[in-house]
Amino acid sequence: MDKNTITGLVLIGILLVGFSFLSRPSEEQIAAQKRYYDSIAVVQQQEEALRAKTEAALANEKEETAADSASLFFSATKGKEAFTTIQNNLVEITLDNKGGRVYSALLKNYMGQDKKPVVLFNGSDASMNFNFYNKKGALQTKDFYFEAVNKTDSSVTMRLAADSASYIDFIYTLKPDNYLMSFVIKATGMDGKLAASTNYVDISWSQRARQIEKGYTYENRLADLTYKYTGDDVDNLSASKDDEKSVSERLDWIAFKNQFFSSVFIAEQDFEKTTVKSKMEKQGSGYIKDYSAEMSTFFDPTGKQPTDMYFYFGPNHYKTLTALDKGREEKWELNNLVYLGWPLIRWINKWITINVFDWLSGWGLSMGIVLLLLTIMVKIVVFPATWKTYMSSAKMRVLKPKIDEINKKYPKQEDAMKKQQEVMGLYSQYGVSPMGGCLPMLLQFPILMALFMFVPSAIELRQQSFLWADDLSTYDAFITFPFHIPFLGNHLSLFCLLMTVTNILNTKYTMQQQDTGAQPQMAAMKWMMYLMPIMFLFVLNDYPSGLNYYYFISTLISVVTMIILRRTTDENKLLTELEAKKKDPKQMKKTGFAARLEAMQKQQEQLAKERANKQNKK
């Protein structure tokens, strides 16, 4: 460092020291500033003291208000949380003394993905509160500690006591071999202590439905909040978006539903003034839906009549749910929790599919074999309709050379009406109806759709393996991608891929079968017919492997049937038979659809000629 730099730094230092000395405040200024800050501190202390006093007053007011309404059960406002378990051979229920509510529900005979018994909910997953009323306000059971009395292995009474002679009992009882739990609310010695004019209890119930199955997308699609109108039909909230509804009608029950399991709350005296909500949960959160319901039901504060209710924590198994109505005059119809399709298809599944499926399952066969046999049986039932559809197409196919001649005769577009009229006349002469295969196809559609609706709801397929699929109730991912493909997901289902391939083959044979030349525009639509199976690959990739397996087997049988019928049908002989019918005078009479269509075409042609003549005269 040179001499000039050192000199400059020294001068700068002297300037800074001198400036600091000259700019310092005087003693009067320092004293005034100290008084100013002291006054601010005093004001702040006063404000803090006032705020603390106000908050304490508000807290005391809240405590006094709560104490006024809860003074009836003052001794129950303090306690230590404890749990009581009741069980039978099917279900284990844990009850919490805080609020006297159901804390958790475990199903012993059904395993989760972790190979442990399925837990429908536990702890903070669910909540339940009952509001009783006295002259001073609401008594919320969630704020009180109940006492467990009269405990057995399968029943317990959770008691909220005002004193030894005045209390409200929540009585829980599990029946043997049953997922149904009786729940009775009964007041004893509360006459005059609860508002006699209030003959109802308000209930708040909520549950976050856990993701129990492997496939979030499909399980979420079949999970919804369902409820049944008293003496009427069943309704539900949307399963695909957040939904809320206020229900003015009386309800028999409300169900928080997963794909294969449900938590159902049933009221013998009905629910009323009900509001139900369902919110979607994010994928990966471990939950699929957040359900909640607020409702009221009958309650007798005098204790003369108990409030009878039930909980059902169990599988969505059709016959299990149906059995709950045995001996009841007013049916709960909880079997509506199992979706079996539209009315006609549901009827087929209810009376035929389920019974045949149970019969085959009783042989102790693999569920994959049961589905195979069931599919074959369905194909046998619909074979007469399949054969009739095929023969109708075969007759039209052997007439294709004659149709081609008509097409050559009328090559111009303006002659389309004449060409169509002559084609229909040809069909009529040979006794062939172009719509002959449509009715049989429509008749077999409900039967084929019945299985399509039944398989995804069949809890019997849950965790049942077959070939490479470890669970027929969810997708079989034989390839898993480290990324997400739009509309496809992060995996590829092998049964879905096989189903797609067989559908393409089926489309090919069907198009060949229907290539009669009568509809040239079909050539432009062929690519759409081949596109449909590709679309199915994206749509059904997340669907249960059991469903894709059924669809694959069903389509494969259709392809094989088509090939066999094609090879065993002598088309020359068929044409000879048609020629013989043409020569038969009885066949010359135009009847049915073809005759009506031909008559309409002639009428349209006549009207067109009349309009043309009028225009020429002008």
UniProtKB/Swiss-Prot annotation:
Subunit note: Interacts with the Sec translocase complex via SecD. Specifically interacts with transmembrane segments of nascent integral membrane proteins during membrane integration.
Location (main, coarse): membrane
Localization (cell): Cell inner membrane
CC per GO annotation: plasma membrane
GO terms classed as biological process: protein insertion into membrane; protein transport
Keyword Translocase: no
Family: Belongs to the OXA1/ALB3/YidC family. Type 1 subfamily.
Organism: Bacteroides fragilis (strain ATCC 25285 / DSM 2151 / CCUG 4856 / JCM 11019 / LMG 10263 / NCTC 9343 / Onslow / VPI 2553 / EN-2)
Keywords for the protein's UniProt record, in alphabetical order: Cell inner membrane, Cell membrane, Chaperone, Membrane, Protein transport, Transmembrane, Transmembrane helix, Transport
Name of the protein: Membrane protein insertase YidC
